[in-house]
Amino acid sequence: MSSVYSDKSSSTPAVTGGGFGGEIMLFGVRVKVDPMRKSVSLNDLSQYEHPNANNNNNGGDNNESSKVAQDEGYASADDAVQHQSNSGRERKRGVPWTEEEHKLFLLGLQKVGKGDWRGISRNFVKTRTPTQVASHAQKYFLRRSNLNRRRRRSSLFDITTDSVSVMPIEEVENKQEIPVVAPATLPTTKTNAFPVAPTVGPIIFPVQIDKSREYPTLLRHDHGNSSMLVGPVPMFSMPNPSTAIDLNANHNSTIEPSSLSLRLSLSLDQGQASSTRHSAYNVMSSFSNGESIIRVA
């Protein structure tokens, strides 16, 4: 046994120093390097099996190496992520909110309150989803809280509930009311109100005179008709209508009451005969032909 170990110990520097490749002496045991390298790492066996091919493809196309790795089942996860990022490089941008939608959002915020984004989206901002309404509300409140800290350029969020009046959901229901057509009225002419003096015109009516009572002396000589119809004629002249109405700038006119009155004193009673002496009618009798004549002065 001692001779065996001595032989091995004596041969060890020869092996290592002689540069015999592929073997090493580990604790007196001769170990081959190539089988051991194959079992060192199982992560990249394809690189060990094709060392020359990988060295030649270092300056080549990376797509070919990735395809080979994918075919052998050892593709990297980073390559797959990079491939997906290349396909979705252009990010889909959302449609910005319009001023009308923001005003409807503020109106819904007044009516419904914070938190009910589904109700605001359903009843007010119908063009946006509840998630979009919630995101817009978050940006709005952040803008309002940071408003006093620093000045920012004007944006849509500067329109607040204070500046937006409560729209009669004329803009929501909206803003379109049919005007009621007023009925056409006839044109009226304005006349200056001024007092008009009452005019007294001649009143003509038949008067039947009974000669037998008022004038009993006529009965002796009158053998014909006992009564006759007389149309009285007024004793006064009618005034000019232009002088009866005084139109001045102040529309003040003083009209004296007419002192003329038509008195028809034709009474049938004997007791009133003396009071009718000054009547407008003068009765004269003529006995020449036996007839009574009535003359009007």
From Swiss-Prot:
Protein's UniProt keywords contain DNA-binding: yes
Induction data: Up-regulated by drought, high salinity, and ABA.
Main location: nucleus
Molecular function in Gene Ontology: transcription cis-regulatory region binding
Subcellular location: Nucleus; Cytoplasm, Cytosol
Cellular component terms (Gene Ontology): cytosol; nucleus
UniProt region (Disordered), positions on chain: 44-96
Coiled-coil ranges per UniProt: none
Keywords from the UniProt entry: Cytoplasm, DNA-binding, Nucleus, Stress response, Transcription, Transcription regulation
Cross-referenced SMART domains: SANT (SM00717)
Ranges of Low complexity composition bias in the record: 52-63
InterPro entries: Homeodomain-like_sf, Myb_dom, Myb_dom_plants, Plant_Stress_Dev_TF, SANT/Myb, SANT_dom
Described purpose of this protein according to its UniProt entry: Binds selectively to the DNA sequence 5'-[GA]GATAA-3' and may act as a transcription factor involved in the regulation of drought-responsive genes. Enhances stomatal closure in response to abscisic acid (ABA). Confers drought and salt tolerance.
PANTHER family membership: F25A4.19 PROTEIN, TRANSCRIPTION FACTOR KUA1
Protein name, as recorded: Transcription factor MYB1R1
Organism listed in the record: Solanum tuberosum (Potato)
Lineage of the organism: Eukaryota, Viridiplantae, Streptophyta, Embryophyta, Tracheophyta
